[in-house]
Amino acid sequence: MAALRQIAFYGKGGIGKSTTSQNTLAALVELGQKILIVGCDPKADSTRLILNSKAQGTVLDLAATKGSVEDLELGDVLKTGYGGIKCVESGGPEPGVGCAGRGVITSINFLEENGAYDDVDYVSYDVLGDVVCGGFAMPIRENKAQEIYIVMSGEMMALYAANNIARGILKYASAGSVRLGGLICNERQTDRELDLAEALAAKLNSKLIHFVPRDNIVQHAELRKMTVIQYAPRSKQAAEYRWLAEKIHSNSGKGTIPTPITMEELEDMLLDFGIMKSDEQMLEELLAKEVQAAVAP
């Protein structure tokens, strides 16, 4: 059996990280891979498309019900879904109460101690990436996830989050084996999105693994709590996810130590691509509008 690959999908909230990861993992099953998903997002939506159900019970919720994590059995928290994919959600506290990253730490320790990582080819962590705090960075910090894939788009905040995540990876890369596997761009149909994604990947000393085109069939599948791979296996979008899965599968050992950029460099890049207008351009447009308004009858 090949060595266990521990990968993680990071990305800002709402970027489509969980949807992308579940579709990719469903496609990896078709390549004969055995997979465990560890959801590390407080929304606990990392496995619903694989399980074809509402969010599963989380480790923290079930531990609270039973008394403590020590009172749990592996079967209490681990469910099996599409293609035999094993699913666990770490969960988190109520909003405004405690550290959401605590669930990540508790879950990973529990799963390792109870043999959940045995007999799988991939462990995939689905992690919130708006902030890379100690808890959410746990898969990186503890040298669990060794290949990080950042899901992003051509939108400003998605680019900012991707750069921030790269900074978090860099912090732990020198002391461990964690590497940036690459960027995955979820198309939002912004200006020059593909060019921008490739440019950011290059600046981060990485590569754009795949550009996932926008397609409404993804939403149709999600409404039915299914991946596109399951819902419409012969669709063009399913083929895109299979292509992405193949790229990740062949990317073992090809990760890099990222070179994050400053906020000023990120803004300069947006200016270079004509995405963000300079102060001079904004003033010119404002003056033109004022002149137009003054001469209007």
From Swiss-Prot:
One of its GO terms (molecular function) is nitrogenase activity. Keywords: 4Fe-4S, ADP-ribosylation, ATP-binding, Iron, Iron-sulfur, Metal-binding, Nitrogen fixation, Nucleotide-binding, Oxidoreductase. It catalyses: N2 + 8 reduced [2Fe-2S]-[ferredoxin] + 16 ATP + 16 H2O = H2 + 8 oxidized [2Fe-2S]-[ferredoxin] + 2 NH4(+) + 16 ADP + 16 phosphate + 6 H(+). Binds 1 [4Fe-4S] cluster per dimer. The reversible ADP-ribosylation of Arg-102 inactivates the nitrogenase reductase and regulates nitrogenase activity. ATP binds at G11, K12, G13, G14, I15, G16, K17, S18. GO terms for biological process: nitrogen fixation. Pfam families: Fer4_NifH (PF00142). Belongs to the NifH/BchL/ChlL family. The key enzymatic reactions in nitrogen fixation are catalyzed by the nitrogenase complex, which has 2 components: the iron protein and the molybdenum-iron protein. This is Nitrogenase iron protein. It comes from Rhizobium leguminosarum bv. trifolii. The gene is nifH.
